Swiss-Prot record:
Source organism of the structure: Schizosaccharomyces pombe (strain 972 / ATCC 24843) (Fission yeast)
Official protein name in the record: Probable peptidyl-tRNA hydrolase 2
Biased composition annotated in UniProt, kind: Polar residues: 40-49
Enzyme Commission number: 3.1.1.29
Function: The natural substrate for this enzyme may be peptidyl-tRNAs which drop off the ribosome during protein synthesis.
One Gene Ontology CC term in the entry: cytosol
GO biological process, one term: mitochondrial translation
Catalytic activity: an N-acyl-L-alpha-aminoacyl-tRNA + H2O = an N-acyl-L-amino acid + a tRNA + H(+)
Disulfide bonds listed in the record: none
Region (Disordered): 40-68
A GO molecular function held by the record: peptidyl-tRNA hydrolase activity
Residues with the Phosphoserine modification: 65, 79
Length: 205
């Protein structure tokens, strides 16, 4: 009885080896495919979370080669006062005080406040971008002096010809001076270079 059993085992051994090999191959292939799938998904997830790592881009600095002088010349010829002020980075408002009236310091302060407010309201309506640039730059205000009413009127006309806001304040005449007297000229806000074309020769007050 033992001999047939031995013969059976011997004859069945090659088949068992073959079956084991096939099963092992299929199991190994299954885990290989699963690992590959997980690796591919992880790679895609990394690409999605870090898109900049996939294709780095180099930026050229050739566009920065244009000189500031050329830019300013272009703006002066073709652009608004706001664009010029933004390019220069300097803006101001000037208050030209008439000195021949003998106004007190308090009176002068009040008249300068009237001029500054008047210019601010007009400029805000006409060129709000320019006003915002001036505000963001610190709202510079400079007080200058002139001797006569005629000088104030001349400066006003010159400023307006350059596109600047210019307003002469006339006093109501309730306190120190005659009614209707021109007291202060406000100019701006505007680019420093443009305002200096009008008031560059005046002395500080």
């Amino acid at each position: 009885m033992k001999v047939p059993f031995v013969n059976f085992m011997i004859s069945s051994f090659p088949a068992a080896v073959l079956v084991g090999a096939v099963v092992g191959f299929m199991i190994g292939r299954k885990y290989s495919v699963a690992d590959a799938s997980r690796g591919y998904s992880s790679k895609n997830a990394n690409k999605a979370s870090n898109p900049e790592k996939e294709s780095p881009v180099s930026v050229s600095n050739d566009e920065d080669s244009e000189s500031e002088t050329e830019l300013l010349d272009m703006l002066k010829g073709n652009s608004s006062l706001a664009a010029l002020a933004l390019a220069e980075g300097q803006t101001k408002m000037v208050l030209v005080v008439r000195t021949d009236l003998g106004m007190t310091k308090g009176k002068i302060a009040a008249q300068c406040a009237h001029a500054a407010l008047a210019c601010y309201k007009i400029a805000s309506a006409v060129d709000p971008d320019l006003v915002r640039i001036w505000e963001n730059a610190g709202q510079a205000k400079i007080t200058l002096q002139a001797q006569t009413e005629e000088t104030l009127e001349l400066l006003q006309a010159q400023a307006m010809s350059l596109g600047l806001c210019a307003r002469v304040i006339h006093d109501a005449g309730r306190t120190q001076i005659a009614s209707g007297s021109a007291t202060v000229l406000g100019i701006g806000p505007g680019p420093v270079s443009v305002i200096n074309e009008v008031t560059g020769s005046l002395k500080l007050f």
